[in-house]
Amino acid sequence: MRFDIKKVLELAEKDFETAWRETRALIKDKHIDNKYPRLKPVYGKPHPVMETIERLRQAYLRMGFEEMINPVIVDEMEIYKQFGPEAMAVLDRCFYLAGLPRPDVGLGNEKVEIIKNLGIDIDEEKKERLREVLHLYKKGAIDGDDLVFEIAKALNVSNEMGLKVLETAFPEFKDLKPESTTLTLRSHMTSGWFITLSSLIKKRKLPLKLFSIDRCFRREQREDRSHLMSYHSASCVVVGEDVSVDDGKVVAEGLLAQFGFTKFKFKPDEKKSKYYTPETQTEVYAYHPKLGEWIEVATFGVYSPIALAKYNIDVPVMNLGLGVERLAMIIYGYEDVRAMVYPQFYEYRLSDRDIAGMIRVDKVPILDEFYNFANELIDICIANKDKESPCSVEVKREFNFNGERRVIKVEIFENEPNKKLLGPSVLNEVYVYDGNIYGIPPTFEGVKEQYIPILKKAKEEGVSTNIRYIDGIIYKLVAKIEEALVSNVDEFKFRVPIVRSLSDINLKIDELALKQIMGENKVIDVRGPVFLNAKVEIK
């Protein structure tokens, strides 16, 4: 809210210390349900794979590499050139592209009758136009997604009727089967690099340092926790007369050091792909101090002069590649690549912060005057909670409700002797820790020994909802006062003895959070003695 600057400065001029304390009242607290952690920052969330791709892009650029986009669709002929006798085994893991054939469809009398039976008046001119459409489609001059429109146009009917003509008069279109081509989807980035370099080698000055991060496709027998049929490769090439495997080691270290890896081992790869020069194909193992283990993260090698010669490339080329998803799993701590790449198909796990933000006060006073009264009543209860019983605290306030003057008297009492006005759990605060919900007291005095370790850990490492038992209970009490005013109830009693569940302290939890807690066998333990007794009179 805005405040009176002139008045504030005048107060400060008279007595700065007093003004400093009193102006605290000008900074209003937020509504209980708009406080942290229910109040959350709103921002977009990148996908871990896309985030890793961007980090890799920047890492390559910092190392002086130029970004390229390599061909995704590769003719099988290129695989034969690159792999030689190994090509058939490689092509077995490639996806071939297929397309529907374009049938040679005629327009005989039988089809004309079918069209007429649809209520279409078809004369010789329309027949000729329709024949021309079918002929142009066969030749490829008309695209498949334009065929219905062109049929409708030829017959001078609506698009809907054109579709009906295609379905009923030309059923042969339904029986078409895809026919494979010699085109494949890139199964690894190398197949694209040979094509790119064969074009660049005579145009650009050496050495060349190029990188490309893009999708590849591999026809796996099945997808599992570490293999997908579609993945991203972060690949680079270094092209120059003096290029060797040492360049691969340098690039691997320079690239991966930017992701927290500190030590590196290079081991000969037993696979020995034929597009690499013998004894150059190398696996990169890197040590990540956070994970405390050595991890295989990349492969590099020098392309075979035989494969290079088939593309008129006459200088050595070092190629390094790593799977983006593999690196992302390491960075973000995933154990299953499917759950990381496609989280929408897997169980989403709420963090403690998420769950804490999903715990809210159930019944809250609607009118500002009563909401403020509830806050005042909370402070009074806290100030008097340790009064020896029998005892009571009476609070009387006057309100204007629906144009009428109403006096509200609230009495908080404890009649049983040798007790206190309120029970020891009134200041317990609700925390979320490791997916569990706990009610934790300000101190652990009087708490059973076996509960202290977990409660201490939850308080230190968990997320507080910033809601105490007394908050929820008093908000409910004052909300009932509002209800009583509406219903013309003159008095009522209110009692909360022992808390056993969230509802006992006027809290509710989102169904998503509750589902996770129940599904993971977590606990909601907010038990505690409150012993709050109140009597309300309205005049």
Curated annotation (Swiss-Prot):
GO cellular component: cytoplasm
Residue numbers binding substrate: H188, M189, T190, S233, A234, S235, Y275, Y276, N319
InterPro entries from the UniProt entry: aa-tRNA-synth_II, aa-tRNA-synth_II/BPL/LPL, O-Pseryl-tRNA(Cys)_ligase, Phenylalanyl-tRNA_Synthase, SepRS_C
GO molecular function, one term: tRNA binding
EC numbers, comma separated: 6.1.1.27
Gene Ontology terms describing biological process: phenylalanyl-tRNA aminoacylation
Pfam families: SepRS_C, tRNA-synt_2d
Keywords: Aminoacyl-tRNA synthetase, ATP-binding, Ligase, Nucleotide-binding, Protein biosynthesis
Domain of life from the UniProt record: Archaea
Catalysed reactions listed for this entry: tRNA(Cys) + O-phospho-L-serine + ATP = O-phospho-L-seryl-tRNA(Cys) + AMP + diphosphate
Role played: Catalyzes the attachment of O-phosphoserine (Sep) to tRNA(Cys).
The protein's assembly and partners: Homotetramer. Interacts with SepCysS.
Family stated for the protein in its record: Belongs to the class-II aminoacyl-tRNA synthetase family. O-phosphoseryl-tRNA(Cys) synthetase subfamily.
The protein's name in its UniProt record: O-phosphoserine--tRNA(Cys) ligase
